[in-house]
C-alpha cells in the first residue's frame, strides 16, 4: 500500500541520525530508491518531495572530507544529493501544498543555514501567517515566530 510505504520512508528518514555511520550511508541509498519508487506511483504527493528535500539538504551539507571518508569506509553517499536540490525539492513541495506552513519553515531553515537571512526571514514570516490546520503546524508556527525574533523581526 502506497501510504504505508510512504510512512515507513518518513519513519526511516527521521531515525537515520540514530544509526551508526555505515548504516546511515546505506539507509540514505535505500531511501533515495524508495522515494523514487513512490514518486513513480504518485508524482504529485508533496511528502515525497519533502523527504527527498531533507535527504538532499542533509547529505549535500556534509563536508567533502567526510564524504570522501564515507566513500572509503562505506562505499560512498549518493553523489546526486545536493543542497541546491534540497532547496528545489522543498519549493516543489510548497507548489504542491502551498497552505502547509511546515514546508515554508523548513525552506527558511535551509536559507538561514546557507547564509541567506533575508530569504529565511520571508519564509519564516509566511510560515507564521498561514492558519494552522494540524497540530504540527501549530508547533511550526511558534518555531517560525522564534526564528523571526532571532533575526530581529
Predicted region positions:
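Glycine/small-residue-rich hydrophobic helix-like segments
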Residues: 84-123
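A cross-kingdom marker for long, charged
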Residues: 116-153
